[in-house]
Amino acid sequence: MTLLYRAGSRALARLRAEGLGPGKVSALVGPATGPRWLAFARLDWALHQSGLLTADEEGRRVLLVGASAGAWRMAALATAEPEAALDRLCAAYIRQSFDPDPSPAEVTRAYRRLLREVFPNPIAGHMLTNLERHLGVIVSRAVGAWPKHRSGQLLLFARAFATNALHPSGLARSFRRTLLCAHPGTWPLSPSGDVAPLTPENLHDALLASGSVPGYFEPVRIAGAPAGDYLDGGVTDYHLAQPVTDRPIVLLPHHGPRVAASWFDKHLPWRNSSAELLED
């Protein structure tokens, strides 16, 4: 795998002035990458081993914010033993086996079991109280009821694609972003959309919802979040759709030359994330 490093102007200025070392990274973003996350898991392992993902001299934690499978990677990095958690996640994901045409109910049940296996309850407490890393999980809430059956989901998804293609604001007619994090009042920036607490009681549902690809999963309800049906966080935040912090340096490992805001935008070559988002 070939790695290409790119830096925005503010990030580059800081790198030249201070270098890159422990306490210099303010956030790591885990975008929605589909199965490609398996390759990025090895990079996550290396970042953890390097010591880059540690709090700065003022005690400000590194933000780990992810959507879809990126949220699962970030959750593994928030555990007390990230290498072991990443290994469990990779192994459990690869072992998944389905009939040629599984129902959304079957897929949802399987991944609910997977996430509870990878992140058992005793681990959840540390994930939410980690003194070095602050976990944030992005999910998308459907505006109105979201069907459980594939045909109804795909119909609504196609409508959302059409309205988003006409104008980026059209996405809000179908989906609303929600960020779940422990102690929301300590998150450095107020993201657009809703913010809800991430707790041991809703952690597994939040992670399941963040990876619930429309058409393949049933919608998920999340206790403590605004009432509604939740699904894949990559719908609203595919690569990077909003600032996650006001400090450099933000690491955004992803798989292509473009940075798209929403899942729909990845299919629109003229629609890229704001250049300002990439400055840090």
Predicted regions mapped to residue ranges:
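Patatin-like phospholipase
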Residues: 1-63, 76-280
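Catalytic nucleophile serine of serine hydrolases
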Residues: 68
